[in-house]
Amino acid sequence: LERVLPVIGCYADTIVETGPLGSAHTIKLLNNFLALATGAVVGEALAAAMSLGVDLSVFDAAVRTGGADSAMYRRFAHWALEGDDSHFQATMRIGEKDLRYYRQMADAAELPTAMADAATQLYRLASQLGHARQFMPVLPSILASLADGRERALPRRE
């Protein structure tokens, strides 16, 4: 590991020794699941706030002072508040793929996947509605439009 650290450091922001061969992949899948499931919850909450007419800046102030604040919330909030989806440049299609890999690992170990299944449904729905290439932070706008019928502008990425 010591010999390759300088090379890995050229393209990795964080390097964590995870243990035996294969453990890094397992941890990556777990981390991606946690981030994507959180993103799905954040997306649904922001969509509800949009559809209910909540002042998003007030909602944001409340979230940032409580336990719901997270890196994923902040990445999605940039879109909801400023129309900037660049803070998490992963597409709905990538979300589906990463959750599928997590579910395969969990299924093989006979672990529950209820949250992974629910998150997968939201990213798959966005993809099926024609937004597979959209970055994940626009999920709230897609879900809000579906719920209330009001069209919301999305980045031109299709």
Give the positions of each predicted feature.
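Helical "substrate-binding/catalytic lid" subdomain
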Residues: 23-146
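Terminal low-complexity tails and localization/encapsulation signals of metabolic enzymes
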Residues: 141-158
